[in-house]
């Protein structure tokens, strides 16, 4: 049974840590609406940080940083998992990230994570993952 989590309005880091923990525990997880997840903070600072990550290194040698919102979320989750060990490799195989809602998951009930809601923010400034991706040049 796949647990479907709706990423709409959820904080990126809190969503990622919750998904990572559950995947390591053996759950199959699908995150839909990844482009609607939010990153808290000043818009210019957040976009500057992601631009710097994207421009690091060289095209040939890396490090390679994604542009698409589903790939950015998966990379964030990967940072919270021991992805080079067998346990982490298996956990990463149990995670699926989608932009929007795919047809095969549209009929299933979605979960949300109350601890990860943007309503918890004291400071209302935030940027959606879709806006970051568009800024980086993604065409999703």
Curated annotation (Swiss-Prot):
Signal peptide: none annotated. GO terms for biological process: negative regulation of translation; translation. InterPro entries: Ribosomal_uL13, Ribosomal_uL13_bac-type, Ribosomal_uL13_euk/arc, Ribosomal_uL13_sf. GO terms for molecular function: mRNA binding; structural constituent of ribosome. CDD domains: Ribosomal_L13. GO terms for cellular component: cytosolic large ribosomal subunit. SUPFAM superfamilies: Ribosomal protein L13 (SSF52161). This protein is one of the early assembly proteins of the 50S ribosomal subunit, although it is not seen to bind rRNA by itself. It is important during the early stages of 50S assembly. HAMAP family: Ribosomal_uL13. This is Large ribosomal subunit protein uL13. It comes from Methanospirillum hungatei JF-1 (strain ATCC 27890 / DSM 864 / NBRC 100397 / JF-1). The gene is rpl13.
